[in-house]
């Protein structure tokens, strides 16, 4: 009994030792597997951390870009607002040195532009003034130039030297007129028309021609409304007739041709008459013959039907 108990105890001790050894020292294969798993886990953790860090970096970059773009747009809007405020109100002061310098520049530029615009609107530039003055001077100088040209073209009207004397009595003769009008100047010619039936009687008017136009004017002043043989007369100046241009010779119309002689007219007419019936006769015969045949054929076909 004691031996069996000792054996049991020894077996139990061996089992416990085996258990302890199994728990204390694992096998080398298990150790390798565990080390591989740990290394894999570590590599996975590292990859995940790298990916997360890269993602974080990308997010940070995008955030920085957005913030930079928003900041630049905000700075642009601020600078534009400050410049507009500076141009509209030059007395307003800005907080920053950069904004103050920008506003002062924009204000100065706006003031210079406004001053230039006001000066341009109020008083035109010298070049515009010159242009306007040239236009005005040209427009003003055009009509007198035209008048001068017209005056140059029109020759000065000659002063009259001939005087018409009317309402004369039949007792007045050329000698009487010569005596009266010779007191005002030298007379070149006296024309006193006479009646055909009674050549010793005048028609009641006369023409007196002086050598100088001044003498003719004197005679007009003194004798217009004067009396000769107890009757008032009229004295008027006679203007010299304008020299008429010679009449133009009208050229004969080109369409009208000179008539042909008789010996040329007759042969072509005879030839035309002789040729025309010869040409027409065969054409008429040809045109009639097929018509008759067709008419006959149609009538025959109708009768057969």
Swiss-Prot record:
Ranges of Basic residues composition bias in the record: 1-10, 127-143, 151-167, 266-298
Q: Which UniProt keywords apply?
A: Acetylation, Cytoplasm, Isopeptide bond, mRNA processing, mRNA splicing, Nonsense-mediated mRNA decay, Nucleus, Phosphoprotein, RNA-binding, Ubl conjugation
Which region ranges are annotated with the description Interaction with SAP18 and ACIN1? 159-244
Q: A Gene Ontology biological process annotation?
A: mRNA splicing, via spliceosome
4Fe-4S in keyword set: no
Instruction: Note down the stretches annotated as region Disordered.
Output: 1-170, 240-305
**Oligomeric state and partners?**
Found in mRNA splicing-dependent exon junction complexes (EJC). Found in a post-splicing complex with NXF1, RBM8A, UPF1, UPF2, UPF3A, UPF3B and RNPS1. Component of the heterotrimeric ASAP (apoptosis- and splicing-associated protein) and PSAP complexes consisting of RNPS1, SAP18 and either ACIN1 or PNN, respectively; the ASAP and PSAP complexes probably are formed mutually exclusive. Component of the active spliceosome. Associates with polysomes. Interacts with the cleaved p110 isoform of CDC2L1, CSNK2A1, PNN, SART3, SRP54, SRRM1 and TRA2B/SFRS10.
Say which family it is in. Answer: Belongs to the splicing factor SR family.
Which protein is depicted? RNA-binding protein with serine-rich domain 1
The scientific name of the source species is Bos taurus
Q: Which gene encodes it?
A: RNPS1
């Amino acid at each position: 009994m004691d031996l069996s108990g000792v054996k049991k105890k020894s077996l139990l001790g061996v089992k416990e030792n085996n258990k302890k050894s199994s728990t204390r020292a694992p096998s080398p294969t298990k150790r390798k597997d565990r080390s591989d798993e740990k290394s894999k886990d570590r590599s996975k953790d590292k990859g995940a951390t790298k990916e997360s860090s890269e993602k974080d970096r990308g997010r940070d970059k995008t955030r920085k870009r957005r913030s930079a773009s928003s900041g630049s747009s905000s700075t642009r809007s601020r600078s534009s607002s400050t410049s507009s405020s500076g141009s509209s109100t030059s007395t307003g002061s800005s907080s920053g040195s950069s904004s103050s310098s920008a506003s002062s520049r924009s204000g100065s530029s706006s003031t210079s532009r406004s001053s230039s615009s006001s000066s341009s609107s109020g008083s035109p530039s010298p070049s515009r003034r010159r242009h306007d003055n040239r236009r005005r001077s040209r427009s003003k100088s055009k009509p007198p130039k035209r008048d001068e040209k017209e005056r140059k073209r029109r020759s000065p009207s000659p002063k009259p030297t001939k005087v018409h004397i009317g309402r004369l009595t039949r007792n007045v003769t050329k000698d009487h007129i010569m005596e009266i009008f010779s007191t005002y100047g030298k007379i070149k010619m006296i024309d006193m028309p006479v009646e055909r039936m009674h050549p010793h009687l005048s028609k009641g008017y006369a023409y007196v021609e002086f050598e100088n136009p001044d003498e003719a004017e004197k005679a007009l002043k003194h004798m217009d409304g004067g009396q000769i043989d107890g009757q008032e007369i009229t004295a008027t100046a006679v203007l010299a007739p304008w020299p008429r241009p010679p009449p133009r010779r009208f050229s004969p119309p080109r369409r009208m041709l000179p008539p042909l002689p008789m010996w040329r007219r007759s042969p072509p007419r005879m030839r035309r008459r002789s040729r025309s019936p010869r040409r027409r006769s065969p054409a008429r015969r040809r045109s009639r013959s097929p018509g008759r045949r067709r008419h006959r054929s149609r009538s025959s076909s109708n009768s057969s039907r």
